[in-house]
Amino acid sequence: MANISSPFGQNEWLVEEMYRKFRDDPSSVDPSWHEFLVDYNPESTAEPVLTDPTSTDKQPSATPQAKPAAAADPVASRAKPATTPTVANGTAAGSAAAPAKTTTTPPIEGDELQVLRGAAAVVVKNMSASLDVPTATSVRAVPAKLMIDNRTVINNQLKRNRGGKISFTHLLGYALVQAVKKFPNINRHYAEIDGKPIAVTPAHTNLGLAIDLQGKDGKRSLVVAGIKRCEELRFAQFVTAYEDIVRRARDGKLTAEDFAGVTISLTNPGTIGTVHSVPRLMTGQGAIIGVGAMEYPAEFQGASAERIAELGIGKLITLTSTYDHRIIQGAESGDFLRTIHEMVLSDSFWDEIFRELSIPYLPVRWRTDNPDSIVDKNARVMELIAAYRNRGHLMADIDPLRLDNTRFRSHPDLDLLTHGLTLWDLDRVFKVNGFGGWKYKKLRDVLGLLRDAYCRHIGVEYTHILDPEQQEWLQQRVETKNVKPTVAEQKYILSKLNAAEAFETFLHTKYVGQKRFSLEGAESVIPMMDAAIDQCAKHGLDEVVIGMPHRGRLNVLANIVGKPYSQIFTEFEGNLNPTLAHSSGDVKYHLGATGLYLQMFGDNDIQVSLTANPSHLEAVDPVLEGLVRAKQDLLNKDTNGNQDEAFSVVPMMLHGDAAFAGQGVVAETLNLANLPGYRVGGTIHIIVNNQIGFTTAPEYSRSSEYCTDVAKMIGAPIFHVNGDDPEACVWVAKLAVDFRQRFKKDVVIDMLCYRRRGHNEGDDPSMTNPYMYDVVDTKRGARKSYTEALIGRGDISLKEAEDALRDYQGQLERVFNEVRDLEKHGVQPSESVESDQMIPAGLSTAVDKALLARIGDAFLAVPEGFTVHPRVQPVLEKRREMAYEGKIDWAFAELLALGSLVAEGKLVRLSGQDTKRGTFSQRHSVIIDRHTGEEFTPLQLLANNPDGSPTGGKFLVYNSPLSEYAAVGFEYGYTVGNPDAVVLWEAQFGDFVNGAQSIIDEFINSGEAKWGQLSTVVLLLPHGHEGQGPDHTSGRIERFLQLWAEGSMTFAVPSTPSNYFHLLRRHALDGIKRPLIVFTPKSMLRNKAAVSDIKDFTEIKFRSVLEEPTYEDSIDDRSKVTRVLLTCGKLYYELAARKIKDNRDDVAIVRIEQLAPLPRRRLGETLDRYENAKEFFWVQEEPANQGAWPRFGLELPELLPRLTGIKRISRRAMSAPSSGSSKVHAVEQQEILDTAFG
């Protein structure tokens, strides 16, 4: 028989069984055993040689030195004595193996005799041999409650994510290995070399696991396989090695190496209920650790669960250490068990394990029970519930990268200990006042629901909301068991992920190096957006309008809006759509589109559109809001005051994390959310949180905890969600839409994800963010991880997943081939926009006197009982007088223009800071009751004809928030959504319009050229030098003229009320869809010379060039004129007054009322009337480097040869628009007049 001191110990039976199989049929044994078995002899008496640890001759100890021999009858065989033994493990040196003995009790007739073979025979031998090892056993009872609770936390987290389970043996085995590091003697074993006793300390800890196997015949057997070099393994690696050994044991794939070299063993008889066991110690080992069953102390096993919880009784687990007393002493063994005991109760042990398993939560802590009364603890449980509602998001597992894996997601307010609660309270019942639908509940269940609601893959912030109803609604939706999507819904989510990833992969493969700002790393936003749109369709809404930055835009165009792939790929191929040849165009990731969304699991459909945007991040935000408001106003569904119908167009806004926190226009736009003139019934905000802004990490780009904190200013609920969990993303999207529909408020979704590539496809992010991209480069994408989860749950098969992706890639490939075959259009230089748009022939902007009278009457038609402010009443009376008698001033001329348009069926929208009254108290478009504060809007009376029938027109006037960027963007967007509306925005002073410069540059001036996007927005910019300082002087004419080209806008500086009247009406009626910039007056508002007669409103039209009235009426003689002063705006009146004062009939003053497009023909005709003029001057108030001169000085001589040599009269060139001193201003102004007439 085989030597009982074999290195395989109690596994020897398995080795012998394999040998017999190998002998009969080598192919029946795993090839990894062949080398070992080819010269193995189960009857060899030679024992393995244990090399002196100090020897340099390394001999394998795992392979016995044996000679081939015939197998003997196992019943009659005897173990042969060793001839020259060199090692004796567990016996005296030089002793021979004892002969086999027979029982001293003879069998009784009828007894069944069975020869013990294989494992049973080896057990007999091993147990007999173990009697020669002088052992002792230490026993220690260890509290198991902390292990139970923390294991529950771990396994619940694993179940929600990648699957798998951690056993108590995993935990205790790892603790054993860590304890061995502190007590290396426990890992030693006894040997004799050359007759000398030796304590062998192995170089590594090789932990033997006793694995119970069941054979095909149903018989059970035990093998002990070793996890090698355990001391080098971290917990996750230890678990992997453990599971690998067990799996291969059960699959019959263990090798000889797995059995050899075990230094310490772990056995777990507790799995069959044994509480306390003293296992036998095999030769070659110094100790074996036994783990008993987890049980309550015997005296409490009859107690109820409630009583046990009340008393704070926990289960115990008994650990035994059976050790070789020759080399290990009892104190060492006892201290070893004590160390394991302390370790499994320590904070550091569990912190390490949780970090290793990427459990983002703090482990349960071992603490003594708090004896406070149950009444006091009821209050503390309610405090805990409130804390989770308020701070639970800080504990949520929302970061797919987990870059700082040493930091737990926690907060002191969420710690049981902070509230005077411990793990002993988890099974106690407390009063919870209806939380979760319960009146009373165990703290364990309460804590579980709180964590499921607020701390998993979704973190919710809502306690900053002031409305209790909204808070309660969110609690009811969040604090409930989440319903798992159906298999069909899961497959649909997977199909959207497949579509998103396949699209990016295809483009990356086919168009290497092209910038496309891919969505890779954030693919879950596609099923998220799809779910939100689907939910909008479910609510029966009309349209979802999307505004977003460039990252992921192509993917959204393809997979959300439904833009044809062939069109997208054609743009990549460099083909030019001939229908776009009139525009300069823009890069492919800025373009917009429109599509129709059909519900997958419903019968509704909904319009989906994506607005065009520039690269200026967040600039599209207010534009989107204005566009949506215009669409809502056009639908006009709030006629019955039903808000559910009024806001049937939904804005969906995508952001980047760095931009949302960093761009001020975000806060400006959020501030519009609940204002009457700007409200759209709630915006769905989705932040694609890449956790980086180009190369800047969050800690360098914001001061707040989250990038979303700015949204708290409007009481919007905020949902943080892990982008690696598409099901959570879909759930949050639906919840967000439901909240928006219920409360008509903004909702913010913060989807934490990552950016697979650099800022663009040519960027290497590892240069500046190496650690992040070390993580990103090895991270599996959302599609793969979700596919694995579905397959692991058995929802779909691997083949189904692969087939779905292959099919989608095949579709893209086919489209690509189609694009290759398309007829290519040669890319030609842009013909640009049509600069010379002709005003329709016969267009009349004059109105009937009766309409002027109606408008004048409206200002005195105040409701009965309405009290007009005593300072306003004269203004209203004067307006009625002007409507009948003339001498109409600027403010009333404007109201006449707007009122007449309302009467003609136009929607007129006027907004700006203080616009209802007017910055200079000139407008009074809305009258406020002196006593009640009620409003009366006279021009709204024009919405009905004299017979009471509606005209279809509407007058809307709003005081805007103190904003330029968002306010101008909103009004621009409104004109995109309703091109027929007359939309005017007025700056408080023209100087402040530069706060909206991005909107002017990117949308107003170039939107048509880039995207074919038309706008009729009107900007009213108070402008003029009046000694009020550099910030209350200039609307920056020079900047607008520098931007102007190709007829992109119309700029005008009207100098008479009637010309302003006709300018506004022409803009509204001529059909030309271009923005209008009007530089309006300030001091001229009350200039008695700046008035117009009624016939100027009823008989003429807008005149782009004006002569002095004395020449137009043939009072003065043009032939006397030798000097012509060209000017614009209110300076005309100062020049005219000086001319009269100096009696200069040799000087003529010509006003250019429209600066761009320059009225070249009309100006030329006007100048030709002054045949004797020799000198031409451009006279302006602005400094030489500002105003119209920088452009006119170059342009006028080119367009009109007669103006060659034209000279400038102005202030000197200045860095600021004007002097800060009114006295200096007066001197400069006088100098201009003196020079003009010098």
UniProtKB/Swiss-Prot annotation:
Pathway the protein contributes to: Carbohydrate metabolism; tricarboxylic acid cycle; succinate from 2-oxoglutarate (transferase route): step 1/2; Carbohydrate metabolism; tricarboxylic acid cycle; succinyl-CoA from 2-oxoglutarate (dehydrogenase route): step 1/1
Biased composition (Low complexity): 59-107
Binding, Mg(2+): 657, 690, 692
Cofactor(s) needed: Mg(2+); thiamine diphosphate
E.C. number(s) listed in UniProt: 2.2.1.5, 4.1.1.71, 1.2.4.2, 2.3.1.61
Pfam assignment, any one: E1_dh
Coiled coil ranges: 795-825
Region span, 2-oxoglutarate dehydrogenase E1, N-terminal part: 1-41
Stretch list, region Disordered: 44-108
GO biological process terms, semicolon-separated: tricarboxylic acid cycle
Chain residues that bind thiamine diphosphate: 551, 615, 617, 657-659, 690
Stretches the record annotates as 2-oxoglutarate dehydrogenase E1, C-terminal part: 347-1238
Activity regulation, short description: Alpha-ketoglutarate dehydrogenase and decarboxylase activities are inhibited by unphosphorylated GarA, and allosterically activated by acetyl-CoA, the main substrate of the TCA cycle.
Catalytic activity from the UniProt record: glyoxylate + 2-oxoglutarate + H(+) = 2-hydroxy-3-oxoadipate + CO2; 2-oxoglutarate + H(+) = succinate semialdehyde + CO2; N(6)-[(R)-lipoyl]-L-lysyl-[protein] + 2-oxoglutarate + H(+) = N(6)-[(R)-S(8)-succinyldihydrolipoyl]-L-lysyl-[protein] + CO2; N(6)-[(R)-dihydrolipoyl]-L-lysyl-[protein] + succinyl-CoA = N(6)-[(R)-S(8)-succinyldihydrolipoyl]-L-lysyl-[protein] + CoA
Region named Succinyltransferase E2: 98-346
Example of a GO cellular component annotation carried by this entry: cytosol
Any GO molecular function: oxoglutarate dehydrogenase (succinyl-transferring) activity
Active site residues per record: 325 (proton acceptor)
Binding-site residues, acetyl-CoA: 1050, 1066, 1101, 1104, 1154, 1161-1162
UniProt keyword Acyltransferase present: yes
Role noted for this protein: Shows three enzymatic activities that share a first common step, the attack of thiamine-PP on 2-oxoglutarate (alpha-ketoglutarate, KG), leading to the formation of an enamine-thiamine-PP intermediate upon decarboxylation. Thus, displays KGD activity, catalyzing the decarboxylation from five-carbon 2-oxoglutarate to four-carbon succinate semialdehyde (SSA).
Domain notes for this protein: Is a fusion protein with two major domains exhibiting structural features of an E1 and E2 protein, and a short sequence stretch of E1 localized at the N-terminus, which is connected by a linker region to the rest of the protein.
Family recorded in the similarity comment: Belongs to the 2-oxoacid dehydrogenase family. Kgd subfamily.
Subunit structure, as described in the record: Homodimer. The 2-oxoglutarate dehydrogenase (ODH) complex contains multiple copies of three enzymatic components: 2-oxoglutarate dehydrogenase (E1), dihydrolipoamide succinyltransferase (E2) and lipoamide dehydrogenase (E3).
Protein name in UniProt: Multifunctional 2-oxoglutarate metabolism enzyme
UniProt source species: Mycobacterium leprae (strain TN)
